[in-house]
Amino acid sequence: LMLAYNSSSLAGLLTNTKEAVPESRWGLFFEPNFIVGNRSTTVNRTGYGFTTAGFTMGADYRVWDNLLVGLATGYNYTDAGFNGSGGLVQNNSWPITAYAAYLPETFYIFGSLGYTLNLFDLQRTIAFGGITRNAKSSPTGNQLNAYGEAGYDLKLKPLVVTPTMSLAYTSFGLQGFT
């Protein structure tokens, strides 16, 4: 489910009329997410389960007819654990991303630069002989992302083929813990 808005009035969302409404240079979006997964334990592997929930929202502005700039942020919560005493991890993450798109007639260029703060809670049960202990930690993670993409429209009537090229960079650092 993605909700987006790019108009000068919310009234157009409530009717089926096709009235000409001047288009706003501002756009807003909101996208919730929810993912659940698991894998059963077998002879060769430990099973696990996870849940992720959150949202992304943002706004962009059309500077010119072919130039768009924007800012997006959000929140995600992840809870994952291994079956048995394999441990668990919980993560609260807050991303922020700036982006721009140049969209002339036959090609486009898109780029983004982002940062995500990750706050982890980790737990693992350690059993040795008759002694059982829980190891716990709450490290912080910092993530930087950069992305660039370009594409060109090849108009092959009646088709339009758009070859693209992209480059992505991600750096993740996790605070030390004992």
Each model region followed by its residue ranges:
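Outer membrane beta-barrel translocator domains of Type V secretion systems
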Residues: 1-161
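Aromatic-anchored, glycine/proline-accented short structural segments
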Residues: 159-178
